[in-house]
Amino acid sequence: MNMASEKISIGFLGAGGIARTHAFAINSLKYFYSEVPEIELEAVCSTRKESRDAFAAKFGFKKSLAIDEFIADTTINTVLILGPNKVHFEHLQLALEMPSAKRIYLEKPVCSSLEEEQQMAVIASKTGKQIQVGFQYLQTASVREALAFWKTGKLGNPIHFDLKYY
């Protein structure tokens, strides 16, 4: 089955700021592209039930699930890992174990340590699943402007740059 005719059933692991960005983008695809596969916003998973319920209602997800329910859900064939950085490794491990998940998108950072990265490489190579890593904010105008300002040297010689974008 090719991508144009396959129904994409998406599950989000995470319901915070970057998840809102992805939900908006997915819901907007049909306005920008003439040939978009059928996309179902199947389930959203987050630690707090109240926030995942609100997120599901706001963005049109069918279900709001706890992590164990999410991992067991066989209707999800595409997982977006959008939670806090510290849980990316754990969430990737869980997503790779989902029999129905064919595709996994992982927001940066991939993991928190070299050891996690090495474990991830081994686990991922055994599954044959498609995994993509992304960094969406890098291309936003505000981040590009902030980085350009940093590079001017007007801030001296910074050793760390922590940008919050809301």
What are these regions (language model features)?
Residues 42, 62, 75-77, 102, ...:
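Conserved acidic residues
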Residues 78, 84, 89-138, 153:
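Beta-strand-loop-alpha-helix segment that lines the small-molecule cofactor/substrate pocket
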Residues 20-31, 92-96, 145-150:
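Short, well-ordered amphipathic alpha-helices
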Residues 6-8, 102, 129, 159:
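Nucleotide donor/acceptor-binding cores
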Residues 18, 153-166:
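NAD(P)-dependent dehydrogenases' Rossmann-like dinucleotide-binding region
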